Amino acid sequence: MSDPDVFKILLIGDSAVGKTSLLLRFADNSFQETSVNMTSVDYKNKNIVIDGRTFNLQIWDTAGQERFRTITSSFYRGAHGVLVCYDVTDQLTYNNVRLWMQEIQRYAVLGVSRVLVGNKCDLEDRKLVNTSIAREYADSLGIPFMEASAATGVNVEEAFMAMANEIYRNHMGGSKPSVVNPGSGGTSNTGGKKKFC
């Protein structure tokens, strides 16, 4: 049996939006209440199946580099997709999404797949970022959008599956494939609307 194709995915966004928590929830189904330090772990792997083919998602975290604006073109090298993350309880992190999108344009390959993810949607009473405005922005870019919660797990797997589907469609010639979600044994089609917190 041959090794699976590798999709390199980057997690970017302002510091403390929960990028590492999203990664750990998806890759390990774990969540830590306290801040997670990724300086010792740069990436995690998880295998998924799309249209009967196994793919390895190699998901890279910025490991705190975003605090110092030291993310360089080398971080983006070879990336197939980028999850741009913000915190729904922090308007500034959403405002900075445009800067992150500009950075993707500057450093990533043309046509890299992107997904916009608003994290911490479980904190309804503290929510500041309007869902419809974020959705309109994502629609204007022609990219998937969803709100997720690393704490509860809501839409975390869906966000990474949306990314995998985008990469598959853009780089492998697929078209809205059915995905066997890891751990669920079932399939889902990412073409439908996502539920929000």
Curated annotation (Swiss-Prot):
It comes from the Eukaryota. Belongs to the small GTPase superfamily. Rab family. Pfam families: Ras. The keyword Cell division does not apply. Residues 175-197 are annotated as: Disordered. This is Ras-related protein RabG2. InterPro entries: P-loop_NTPase (IPR027417), Rab (IPR050227), Small_GTP-bd (IPR005225), Small_GTPase (IPR001806). PROSITE patterns: RAB (PS51419). A lipid is attached at residue 197 (S-geranylgeranyl cysteine). It comes from Dictyostelium discoideum (Social amoeba). It is a lipid-anchor. GTP binds at residues 13-20, 61-65, 119-122. The gene is rabG2. It is found in: Cell membrane.
